[in-house]
Regions:
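Compact Cys/His-rich metal-coordination microdomains
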Residues: 98-100
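C-terminal motif of bacterial Sec signal peptides marking the signal peptidase cleavage site
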Residues: 12-15
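Acidic, glycine-rich flexible loop segments
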Residues: 115-117
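Sec-dependent signal peptide recognition
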Residues: 2-9
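N-terminal pre-ligand scaffold of iron-sulfur
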Residues: 20-95, 106-110, 125-141
Length: 141
């Protein structure tokens, strides 16, 4: 009986795995984020329409990019997850995409967070967006 439980325990340990997708995605810090976005305010009013996005500075690693994807809002860290933090690794909004300012100009979809044209190790770091009513959303992690 002890052998049975010993073998069962070993099988259980071998079945556990880590998340290999995030193994090389260690450039961005896991900083606390808690931002209120009221779509009735002028600086966020364009988020009432699909495909529009805004940049919120001084949050996360490089600011936050928020986009209306048609079914709600999605929020991404504006720092390129495939670069060490630097001035050039802060992305700029280009329509429905975000482009890194470094020489390789990594480009990501703001709808999915995935890279465009080139397979990269890491996608954009996403933050949780929850509705708190009255056209107000909370962005947090």
């Amino acid at each position: 009986m002890k052998r049975f439980f010993g073998v069962l325990f070993l099988l259980f340990l071998m079945a556990c795995s880590n998340n290999d997708n995030l193994k090389n995605c260690n450039f961005l810090l896991n900083l606390g984020v808690n931002v209120s976005v009221n779509l009735n305010l002028p600086q966020y009013s364009q988020l009432q329409f699909t495909s529009n996005s805004v940049y919120i500075a001084n949050q996360g690693n490089g600011g936050i990019i928020v986009i209306n994807v048609g079914t709600g809002l999605r929020a991404w860290d504006a720092a390129d997850p495939n670069h060490t933090p630097s001035i050039c690794s802060i992305m700029e909004i280009d329509g429905v995409n975000a482009i890194c300012g470094c020489t390789d100009a990594n480009e990501y979809s703001l709808f999915t967070g995935g890279s465009i044209n080139v397979q990269l190790a890491c996608g954009l770091k996403e933050y949780r967006v929850t509705s708190s009513g009255n056209n107000t959303y909370i962005i947090s992690n």
